[in-house]
């Protein structure tokens, strides 16, 4: 898996090349600025998976242009949803946590855990992705993100388990 989160042409071009080599390319939008939308769209088009939070991206009209992608939108305490190959949004419930201390880093835990879960299932190419696999992997990823929210900082789980 090749992961990138910058709109810089060099990272996007590397993603394009990696994708041409059969590598699963994952692009994460940290914050979308409308005036730079063309840069974001180029990055999305060179990726297999596009992830963002509901806080980072408000206007989802571009999703219709991503029919051959997996689009993931995290919804905070409301869970997560995804759109695989333009098949419509599938919403997954949140993993409950009654001891939320800090949500910093939960998006990173979602991403890392999702990629790890895909690998554990042997889903290393875009053609391997099904709604069932994506749902299972996102639920597993939410478990880690939810657990991380019980601790302070982006590496809460790591420091708590030392």
Question: What do these predicted regions represent?
Answer:
Residues 1-93, 122-128, 132-133, 152-161:
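Ribokinase/PfkB-type carbohydrate-kinase core domain
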Residues 96-162:
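Conserved post-catalytic alpha-helical subdomain immediately downstream of the catalytic base
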């Amino acid at each position: 898996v090749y992961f990138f989160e910058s709109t810089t042409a060099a990272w996007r071009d590397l993603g394009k090349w990696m994708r041409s080599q059969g590598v699963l390319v994952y692009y994460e939008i940290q914050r979308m600025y409308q005036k730079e939308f063309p840069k974001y769209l180029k990055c999305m088009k060179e990726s297999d998976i596009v992830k963002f939070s509901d806080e980072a991206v408000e206007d989802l009209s571009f999703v219709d242009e991503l029919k051959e992608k997996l689009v993931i939108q995290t919804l905070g305490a409301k869970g997560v949803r995804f759109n695989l190959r333009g098949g419509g949004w599938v919403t997954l419930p949140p993993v409950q946590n009654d001891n939320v201390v800090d949500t910093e880093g939960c998006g990173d835990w979602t991403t890392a855990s999702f990629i790890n879960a895909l690998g554990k299932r042997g889903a290393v190419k875009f053609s391997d992705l099904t709604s069932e696999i994506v749902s299972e992997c996102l639920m597993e990823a939410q478990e880690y993100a939810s657990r991380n929210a019980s601790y302070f900082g982006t590496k809460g789980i790591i420091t708590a388990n030392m």
